[in-house]
Amino acid sequence: MNDGKKFGFTTTILHSDRQKPIEHGSLHKPIHTAVAYGYRDARELADVFQGKKPGYRYGRQGNPTVTALEEKITRMEEGVSTLCFATGMAAIGALVQALLRTSDHVVSSAFLFGNTNSLWQTVDLQGMPVSFVDATDVANVERALKPTTRMVFVETIANPRTQIADLARIGALCRERGILYVVDNTMTSPYLFRPKDVGASLVLNALTKSIGGHGNALGGSLTDTGLFDWSHYPNIAESYKRFAPAQWGMAQLRAKALRDFGGALGPEAAHHLAVGSETMALRIERESSTALALATKLSADARVAAVYYPGLPTHPQHAIAKQLFRAYGGLLSFELKEGFDCFDYLNRLKIAIPASNLGDTRTLVIPVAHTIYHEMGPARRASMGIAESLIRVSVGIEDTDDLLDDFAQALNA
């Protein structure tokens, strides 16, 4: 596997661990549960702490099992390095903790996962201004920029309404202005899309979703694509400038976010996520094809008011999705027409499960306005296009016909 040949996506993931010798010939990287790491020579321990030699210091800052997962993700995203965190939200929080100051300004897409939106609102309330814009048009992002803008944050496919940011043109704008461009790749995954191709500086993945894919482990990651020039970023502390400039951002993230705030990914979760990632392409192909079939069927039903799925030709950003993504993913949402109660509908489903997660092998559904967006209130929900009857669907890997029949019978009952 080290002869320089470029392999396919799944082959690369499956054999990623073999880039280095694995203990005792194990085919999977073992789970290392140690919190501390001993050295026979105390000077070597000091060298590791001072960054003069590679090695592990304490479980909060690094672990061999987590490192193996980080290296897999780096290869998936074709980046230069990756840091893993306890959750996807911890990874987003790390951006604030390690790379931003209260005098900075952030431009964020207005179309975000509910908890991400809440986090950026909290940041704004604490004194770091955040501008929320319609990121489907780069002009809105450009108008929001200020001399103090340090970061632009977008999701590839917005959860739950599936709006798609003007990814390539925002990337070009950030590159021209020297602004950190953070792209949340969770809804597309590294299999469907590589944000590096549109100029992303950092790529965020909620590993719980498509990468892990089985709903049995939490995790998040940030990948440095190698495209951003950290030597011009004003928020790097002098202590991290002893490394090569290309390493400054991740060195500061590891220390200021992982070490100081403690959002470390545990080795057991890392192992689950790494094993889950091996079937990512197979799962996403199935989820994408079934989601397209379901979206098509729902959009033809007179009892459904609207269907949101990038694979439909009627989707406002269908052309961008078709150009950039390998397929359209397993996330869709739809609204029932007036007179149909979303709770009654969900309760009639026999296969799809009312639950709050995405990217699971099982199909999951949730009444968005009444659960994950309830805290925002009706006015903010309306501004984000969240109707009271909106149902989010995370399509799993069940047999397609079984799912189509399930959603149909719930309408017919």
Residue spans for each PLM region:
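N-terminal glycine-rich, Lys/His-bearing helix-loop that initiates the first secondary-structure elements
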Residues: 1-53
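Conserved PLP-enzyme active-site core in the AAT-like
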Residues: 2-5, 13-22, 82-301
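Glycine-rich beta-alpha junction loops
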Residues: 18-20, 33-39, 209, 226-228, ...
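Conserved N-terminal alpha-helix of the aminotransferase class I/II PLP-enzyme fold
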Residues: 36, 41-93, 115-122
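PLP-dependent enzyme catalytic core of the Aspartate aminotransferase-like
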Residues: 80, 131, 147-150, 340, ...
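Conserved small-domain helix->loop->beta segment predominantly found in fold-type I
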Residues: 261-263, 285-286, 291-360, 376-382
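Short, well-ordered beta-strand elements within core beta-sheets of diverse protein domains
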Residues: 272-282, 329-337, 392-396
